[in-house]
Amino acid sequence: MDTINQRIGEMLARVRATRPLIHHITNLVVMNDTANVTLHVGGLPVMAHDVEEVAEMVTHAGALVLNVGTLSPDWVESMLVAGRQANELDIPIVLDPVGAGATQLRTMTNLKLLRSLHIGVVRGNGGEIGALSGAGGEMRGVESIAAPENPLTAARTLAQTYRTVVALTGARDIITDGERGFIVSNGHIWLTTLTGTGCMATTMVAAFAAVERDYLLAAAGGLAMFGLAAELAAEKAHGPASFKTALFDQIYNLTPEQVAAGARIAELEW
């Protein structure tokens, strides 16, 4: 795994050197935090939602984030327009299917995006991935309260069905393209005390995907760095508020060498 860890460190170095624009069509709850995370990891954020400009904006982007946390018909149309342009230009799309499984509207909207666009990475929790794969799982609002019985099978099924990379995040993160896969063990329980940390993780994945065509490895790298930052932040924090501040500081201050040394990634065995 040393070579994989080295490649992850090199990806972070490329993000910092090239400062890719990450175009978000995202939810109102996390917009400010995900913009800041994009800046701290080394990218440039833009939150452009209007259907009249998204196709033009995405032409400048290194990656496109589609996040359905605060759904509206206008924004879904913008996601489809931006996504088609991203596909035309071979720009990676990272989908965050917030709340899939909680309501029929959320589930069907995410399935429409998956069927209409080629999605590079789907980053979701166990309940969301279970709902989209047909494997089950339980959501309360946008929070996963029960993962599918076999999360690995759910992730693999969704990846194979839509020819995408699935990053199922939890106590340990499962990342697979349906054939290969990784387990990322970095992280901290305090991530569950803040709203929007899954959306922040999605932004990290997008930043890495903007500089790495192997989206499986990019997803593993973004999640490993985010989890490592959380571990280090928890050492300095006294509760959720100080943890959030420390998390942002750690994302900003982590070096490629530290990420390569601290990432805990194992190859999946089927």
Swiss-Prot record:
Residues binding ATP are: R123, T169
Q: Does the keyword ATP-binding apply?
A: yes
- Which cofactors does the annotated protein need, by name? Mg(2+)
What's its top-level EC category? Answer: transferase
Q: Report the pathway entry.
A: Cofactor biosynthesis; thiamine diphosphate biosynthesis; 4-methyl-5-(2-phosphoethyl)-thiazole from 5-(2-hydroxyethyl)-4-methylthiazole: step 1/1
What processes in GO biological process is this protein linked to? thiamine biosynthetic process; thiamine diphosphate biosynthetic process
- The record lists the organism as Roseiflexus castenholzii (strain DSM 13941 / HLO8)
Entry binding sites for substrate: M47, G196
Q: What is its EC number?
A: 2.7.1.50
Its biological purpose: Catalyzes the phosphorylation of the hydroxyl group of 4-methyl-5-beta-hydroxyethylthiazole (THZ).
Q: Which keywords, in A-to-Z order, does the entry hold?
A: ATP-binding, Kinase, Magnesium, Metal-binding, Nucleotide-binding, Thiamine biosynthesis, Transferase
Signal peptide coordinates:
none
Kindly indicate whether the keyword Amino-acid biosynthesis belongs to this entry.
no
Q: Which reaction(s) does its UniProt entry say it catalyses? A: 5-(2-hydroxyethyl)-4-methylthiazole + ATP = 4-methyl-5-(2-phosphooxyethyl)-thiazole + ADP + H(+)
Q: What is this protein called?
A: Hydroxyethylthiazole kinase
Q: Tell me a Gene Ontology molecular-function term this record carries.
A: hydroxyethylthiazole kinase activity
The family note in this entry says: Belongs to the Thz kinase family.
Any Pfam family: HK
